[in-house]
Every structure is written in C-alpha cells, then in structure tokens.
C-alpha cells in the first residue's frame, strides 16, 4: 500500500476527528434542549417534559420528527437566497470554531497557533447570520431584533477578546494547547485571571443571546425577533445553533480558565482526561441554564450601558495589571 503515505494518513485522521467532533457537538446541542427543560422544571418545582418515554427522554426525538415534517416555508416577500443562507452561517460558524478546542492531550481537530484568533473570527461571522436573517425577512420585528443582536454582539465581543488578552500576555501564545500546558505547569487561570473570567462569562452569555441577554428575540417586545419568519428546519438550525454556542463557550471556559483536561490521577488513568473536560464543560452548561432560571431580563439600554460602563473598565484594568506583572517578572 505505497499510496498510503504518512501525509495521507494525517489527512484521513484529521477528517475522521472533524466528523466525530461535528456529530458529537450537534448531538450535545440537541440533547441540551431536553436537559434544559428538565433542569428548569426541577428548579421551578414542576415536572418538565415527562410524557414521551421515561422522564421525557424521547422528547427530543418527538421534537425532531415534528420539525422535519413542518413546512419549510419561505415568505414570498423575503430575499430567498439570503434568507436560506442565514441559518447555515449561524450553525456552521460555531461548528467550525470547535476545531480549535483541545478535548484531551491527544484528541482535537486542529492545533492552530492562532487558535483564539480563529475562534473570534468564527464568532464574528454569527453577526452576519443575524443581520442576514433580519434584513432578508422583510419584517420590521425581525429587522429590529437583528439590529439589537448586531449591536449587542459586536459590543460584547470586544470584551470577550479583551478578557483573554491577559491569558495571552502570560502564556505568550494564542495556541489553546499551549494555554492548557501553561496551566498544568503553573496554576489554573481562574486564580490570576479572575476578573478576565468574570468578564468572559458575562460576554459569553451576551454573544450567545441567552437570558438575561436575549433582547434580540424578546417575545414580549419583538415577537421572537429575527426568528419570526422562520419555520421548519431553518428555524431548527437557529435553535440548535444557540445550544451549540452554549457548549462552545462552556468548553472554552473549561479550557482557558480551568485547565481543560487537567486533573488528578492522569499519570495512572489517562482516560480520565476526557472525563475532566466533559465534567468542567457540563458544569458551565448547567450554569448557563441556572442563569436563565434565576435572573430577570433587563432593558436593552441597560444591557448596552453595562457593557461599556462596567465590562470595559474591568477588562482594561485586568489587562493593564497583567501587563505590568508580566513586565515586572521579565525584569
């Protein structure tokens, strides 16, 4: 088999890893809709889904069947090409961003030297998806929702990036594996970069448009915002894309601030690395759901004021202090 060169083997393994990670993330995003409803029911002293299968475990299958058989309707007054393109970008950009997440020491799709920058590039594409959805729907509520979402996402992505610059300054690299290795050799970044962690988790909730930062799709004000004209699988792609965003931000929180796959007993039980990563990611996913269950939605102007009046000073102070400490250590 002379044709099976080392380069070809590397390509095949990368493709297989990408497919496995892609399917796992999509399945996790879909399952999260059931998990969220069960947890919300538990915290609100009610049952949640409990009719389809034991503990409502087959509710996801019922929802998928319903979604598949709904009419894939495109409004006659919409820009059909852009209307169809928007959910593809919304879901696809977040799936591609998962390529830079190192799940275990040996498992990950891409080991990029610009890993964090690649994440910001893919996250920035979701703004286009929201804008395309609102503009192409030719609906005033959809347009208002997309304008809200664009302003909110662009604002909070600034602080999402600034909150990680302290980590980059300490490690001296944008590579995700280098960041995890630095935490293994020294200390998890939740301690020296606590203010960066606080800003990142707030901005992460905002850019995923999760409650209490779900003003772009506020049902009471905008009748579901930029989703309003979508139905069937197009709406389903937006829906699953939102949960994929939650999984992505949770995985980044675990990787950047809590050591990723790092934990005790890895020398004797290396398979625990995946368990540690999954447990840390699952904790932050539950935190996202708990935030939705416990906090009220503020006004839109309060959300934007909070970003520039609270998050901006916090991230700048964190970055300046980190820079000063790095320079002092280098002397």
Swiss-Prot record:
Top EC class of this enzyme: translocase
Task performed by this protein: NDH-1 shuttles electrons from NADH, via FMN and iron-sulfur (Fe-S) centers, to quinones in the respiratory chain. The immediate electron acceptor for the enzyme in this species is believed to be ubiquinone. Couples the redox reaction to proton translocation (for every two electrons transferred, four hydrogen ions are translocated across the cytoplasmic membrane), and thus conserves the redox energy in a proton gradient. This subunit may bind ubiquinone.
Database matches in HAMAP family: NDH1_NuoH
Family: Belongs to the complex I subunit 1 family.
Localization: Cell inner membrane
Record-given protein name: NADH-quinone oxidoreductase subunit H
Transmembrane regions listed in the UniProt entry: 7-27, 81-101, 114-134, 154-174, 187-207, 238-258, 271-291, 310-330
Taxonomy, superkingdom: Bacteria
Listed GO biological process terms: aerobic respiration
